[in-house]
Amino acid sequence: MTQKELAYFEDAVGHESNIIKILEDLLKSISDNRVVEFIKEETGKHSVRKEKLINFLKEQSNE
C-alpha cells in the first residue's frame, strides 16, 4: 500500500470516528424515540465501517 493510500484510509477512520462522536453527542439532546432509534442505527453503521477500515489496515500491515 502506498503512503497516499494509507493516508486515505487513516483519514476515513478519522472521519468515521468524528461522525460517531457527533451522533453520540446528538443523542443526548433528542427526546423523540423514533429519532433516537434512527440515530442509534446510524451510529452502529458507522461503527461497523470504522471497524472494517481498521481491520483492513491491520491486514495490510501483516502482509
Range-by-range predicted roles:
Residues 1-63:
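His/Met- and acidic-residue-enriched segments that coordinate or traffic transition-metal cofactors
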